[in-house]
Amino acid sequence: MIRRFHIVAIPIRIVVNRFGDHNPNGMIYVLKENESLIKKKVELNPYTPVDLVEPLVIRANVGDEIEILFENKLPFNTSMHIQNAEYDVLTSDGAFVGFNKDTTVKPGESIMYKWKVETEGLHFFSDLGNTLSSELGSNVHGLFGALFVEPRGSWWTDPVTGKPINSGAFADIHNPLLPSFREYGWFFNDEMEVDDLTGQKPINPHTLQPEATHSVNYRAEPMRNRLRLIQEGVVCPDCESEEVHHDSWVFGDPDTPILRAYKGDPIKIR
C-alpha cells in the first residue's frame, strides 16, 4: 500500500507548561491539513500548551511504501532524514553528503521523499539540513518526529473519540488477527531553549542560577515553578516539607503527557 503525507516544517511558539514557560523559536513538523489550525490555536493561546503542538507521529504498516511531499517554511535548508527505513540515498536521504545530490529543501521550496518499511516499530526522523547543536540548530527547537510501523493489516484510531486519525503521538492500534493495543510516542528533548512567562531565562530558586529545561513531547514540569509558589505561600501555605512540590494533590497533574489506559489494556511505549 502507498501512503501519502504532505508535511511542512514551520516555526511555532512552543509553550511547555501552564506556568507560561515557552520556546519563542520553536520548530515542528506538521501535516499540511493541520497547519492553519495549529497556528490559529497557538496565536489564541500564547501562554498555554496547545494539544496539537507535539512531535509529529505518522503511521504505516509493514510492507507499505510512503511518499512524503515535504515543504519547508523555515528560513534555512531543512529536511526529513529517517532511520531504519529503505530509500534511495540519491533522492530521499534528506541530507547533503559527499557527492550525493542535495536532498535538503531551501526555504519556500518542497521535495518528494519515498520510503519503504519492512520492519515493525519506531522509525525516527529529524532535520539534517541544519545540524548545529547550538540554539542556532533545528533539532534542539523541536524539528523531529517518527514513523511508527504497525503489523500488516492494522489501522489506528483516536484513543478518545475512536475515529480514524492521520497523525498523533497517542493512538489505539487495531488488527483483524491480533489484539488491539494502546500506543504512546514518548520523545525526550534535552535543553530546548525555554524562556519564562516574562521572556527571561528561568532561574532555579535554590541556586539562583539560570536553569535548563528537559522536556517530553514538548512539555516540561520543572520543579522551579512549583517550589517558588510554595515558598511564596501562593499554593498550600500550610503545607510542610519541600517535597510537596512533587504532589499532584497540590498542583494537579503535571503538564508532561499522561499515559491513560484501563486496567488490563495492552500498551506499547515507543
Region spans (language model):
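N-terminal, post-signal-peptide metal-ligating segments of extracellular/periplasmic oxidoreductases
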Residues: 1-104, 184, 196-268
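Interdomain boundary/hinge segments at the C-termini of tandem beta-sandwich modules
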Residues: 9, 147-151, 188
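Short alpha-helical segments and helix-capping/turn motifs at coil-helix boundaries
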Residues: 52-54, 65, 110, 129-134, ...
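Extracellular/periplasmic metallocenter environments
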Residues: 74-81, 85-89, 94-158
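Active-site-proximal structural scaffolding
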Residues: 120, 140, 179, 262-264
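Compositionally biased low-complexity segments at domain edges in trafficked proteins
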Residues: 157-197
